[in-house]
From Swiss-Prot:
Gene this protein is translated from: nrdI
NCBIfam families named in the record: nrdI (TIGR00333)
Gene3D superfamilies documented for this protein: 3.40.50.360
Regions that span the bilayer: none
Species this chain originates from: Mycoplasma genitalium (strain ATCC 33530 / DSM 19775 / NCTC 10195 / G37)
Protein name listed in UniProt: Protein NrdI
GO molecular function annotation: FMN binding
Family to which the UniProt record says this protein belongs: Belongs to the NrdI family.
InterPro entries (UniProt xref): Flavoprotein-like_sf, RNR_Ib_NrdI_bac, RNR_NrdI
Function field: Probably involved in ribonucleotide reductase function.
GO BP: protein modification process
């Protein structure tokens, strides 16, 4: 995990109510999309095309890849499409947690997008996984999300 993680106090965590719902971004490589498909939860994708936008009406966990070059190159860690989505106050207020993907080849910036979003929105960073994720990552993410939602089916 990234060394700059802000710990969200238990009393500050706003657990979602209802069935698990995921909002995610995946580039044209579809790495994150393939991971999401394995989870089996209802989901909505943030469009790759920056001119398109979405609005959500459910509380959600955001799953976001990290874009940065490693080392001191931290600019652009959060994809522009995700920033645009979160700049919508309504969308931002419904986010309850974040899960990040990344590449361990980039060292300290591994899953940095999750750290950035967690700090900015004051939501917990629930999990991190590399690239496409492993079978264990899928299972752990399923458990984390199901437990995080108070009334999951």
């Amino acid at each position: 995990m990234h060394k700059d993680i802000k710990l969200v106090k238990e009393t500050e965590i706003r657990k979602p109510i209802g069935s698990p719902f995921i909002v995610y971004f995946s580039s044209i490589s579809n790495n994150t999309h393939r991971f999401i498909e394995k989870l089996g939860f209802q989901h909505k994708r943030i469009p790759v095309d920056i001119t398109q936008s979405i609005t959500v009406s459910n509380e959600y966990v955001l799953i976001c890849p990290t874009y940065s070059g490693g080392g001191n190159q931290v600019e652009g860690a959060v994809p522009k499409q995700v920033i645009q989505f979160l700049n919508n106050k309504h969308n931002r207020e419904l986010c309850r947690g974040v899960i990040a993907s990344g590449n361990t080849n980039f060292g300290d910036t591994f899953c940095l997008a999750g750290t950035v979003i967690s700090k900015k929105l004051n939501v917990p960073l629930l999990y991190q996984f590399e690239l496409l994720g492993t079978k264990n990552d899928v299972e752990q993410t399923q458990k984390i999300i199901a437990n995080f939602f108070q009334n999951s089916n």
